[in-house]
Amino acid sequence: MYTHDRSMVAILDWLAAIGAGSAGELAASCGLSPRATGARLRAMEDAGVTRSLRLLHGAPALHVLTRRGLRAAGRPELDPVAVSASGFAHLLAVARVAVALGNAGHRVGGERELRAWERAEGRPLASAEVGLARDGTVALHRPDLVCWGAGAPIAIEVELTVKAPARLRTIVRGWARSRLVGGVVYYATPPATRALRRALRSECAGDRVAVIPLDRAGFLPGFRSTSSIPSAA
């Protein structure tokens, strides 16, 4: 049903990598018309490989892969995305940022994909250390998205709301000290931007962490420190 239909394969691949997206993001990322995207999504949901959820008034439905869909995508190591009312807007924003980065020519992966790769490798690949977990192991913070390329990866965070100041400083400090990534980009709303800038000043992290308005998603700045990142990272 899927391997002979390149557009369905593209939808499977994108949802497996990013996690969730509306029909609009899938159409844009897979090069399909809205009508063609809708027809394929209906067929895929009927076949049990995707499910759709509409939990936010005025927002489009989000589509995610089921376990059957992950197997069809060749990604059985990934867990299905859990969609909640509280996290719906963030998942939608992450999908839109992923499309913008993809349209700008970047290879983009999601947080679940990164988690699976790090589990398989037995080490962090593009995560920040943020202290110790309850069991005494290093606690990791993973970004929402990762831009992969020939050099060090770029961690992408999508910040819609304001985190508690202490928690935000801890995350920013972890990113500032990380030598696994070439830099970190926060695409943020105005309130989140103000909080992030305070955290950046507090942690002297401006050379490693950039804050960009959410409506400019897709733009990636240069980072002066990328040349010091080991190529094996």
Region spans (language model):
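Non-catalytic C-terminal interaction segments of nucleic acid-processing enzymes
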Residues: 3, 10-14, 23, 162-173, ...
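A short, highly charged nucleic-acid-interacting micro-segment common to nuclease
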Residues: 78-93
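Amphipathic coiled-coil/heptad-repeat helices and related helical stalk/stem segments
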Residues: 37, 94, 141, 168-171
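Nuclease-adjacent, charged terminal/linker segments that flank catalytic cores
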Residues: 1-82
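Active-site metal-binding core of divalent-cation-utilizing nuclease and nuclease-like domains
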Residues: 53, 85-87, 102, 106-154, ...
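Metal-dependent nuclease catalytic cores in nucleic-acid-processing enzymes
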Residues: 95-102
